[in-house]
Curated annotation (Swiss-Prot):
Complex and partners: Interacts with host TAP1 and TAP2.
High-level lineage: Viruses, Duplodnaviria, Heunggongvirae, Peploviricota, Herviviricetes
Listed name of the protein: Protein BNLF2a
Membrane-spanning residues: 41-59
Any one GO molecular function term: protein sequestering activity
Biased composition (Polar residues): 14-26
Organism of origin: Epstein-Barr virus (strain B95-8)
Amino acid sequence: MVHVLERALLEQQSSACGLPGSSTETRPSHPCPEDPDVSRLRLLLVVLCVLFGLLCLLLI
């Protein structure tokens, strides 16, 4: 189990784009911009995972 001794260190590491654990004063007021390439890559990974899962089920 890992314990973070310095709360400021934890907030500094998790404050990007309003991640959970960041305090409200360090969160940016605007959401992170959505990159279309990242969205396509995420969709491709989901489709590949589903196809791999179906292949595994068929091989059982």
